[in-house]
Amino acid sequence: MKSFLLAAALASVSAPAPAVAPEAAWRADIADTNKAYTVTPHAILKIQDAAYLGEGNVASLMGQRGVPGSYKWVQGYQPGAALVAAFSGGKAALKKEDKPLANSLADIEVDKDVDVQAYPTQVQAGVPGIRVFVYNQQNPATKAFKGVDYFPYNPAFIVTADFTPDPNLPPRSFITSRRTSKQFYHAGVAHFILQGKQFDLPFYADTNDPKKITSLSAFFTDDLTGKGAYGAGRYVDAPDLKSFPPKQFKIDFNYAYNPNCARSAFFTCPVAVDHMALAVFVGERDPHLHH
């Protein structure tokens, strides 16, 4: 479940392409990821602040006109705010200069090089709310970014897994990087052999409606976690499912990636709890050790 924000950021740069060799496709995916971190208008590292709002919560965006780096959220209603965001009656409600906006989930320009976007989210497991990001097109974090860092590509870490679905798709709550909780649905278990070892790895969906499940994700740690791989674990996806449940699907650990929280404090990412007793020397490295 590579972050929908990453997917949204890539929307402006990605286009259908002819089939390419697996390693070339992997390198292209890394290039797109780098763009999603720094280049696109809603790049991840352009986020300057975030407000997470549940039912009845209000936040005010305060800042100095003409100074993009000054815009920050303040809890509650503040007179003179550039923008006021609230979540009420299960819906986002945003006001600019005290005037309600017709579409509170649209991109909102606040100042030169500063815009705001609200997204549906969970403020606790299964509890709806919104997260409202402030984007600064001149954010210094984009200049400091050196690109994502991956272990070398190795086709030996591509497996075909048999899948045992969980017919009930029960909810499972994960502790997040912000010490809140976030709910996903246990879709089933993937069974595969990797480096001569048998693994049974749980996969999760973001909906419990089988007709809407088009991809699955595993949140895993391995023997490299904290020793070259990100300490909160990595994610790997089974994308582009034709239907659910599949009998089998491919897992390519070369694409194992860090949650957005590895580089941005403004996200709430589930902390992995499913362990693989193997050093997975592919996928993304820990950015704090290598950059």
Where are the language model's segments positioned?
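Sec-dependent signal peptide recognition
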Residues: 1-7
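Extended, aromatic/histidine-rich regions of cofactor-dependent oxidoreductases associated
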Residues: 150, 248-250, 254-291
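Forkhead-associated
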Residues: 52-98
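Surface-exposed beta-loop interaction hotspot
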Residues: 122-184
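N-terminal signal peptide c-region/cleavage motif recognized by signal peptidases
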Residues: 12-16
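Mid-length scaffold segments of soluble, non-membrane domains
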Residues: 183-230
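Acidic, glycine-rich flexible loop segments
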Residues: 217-257
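N-terminal cleavable signal peptides for secretion/export
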Residues: 19-69
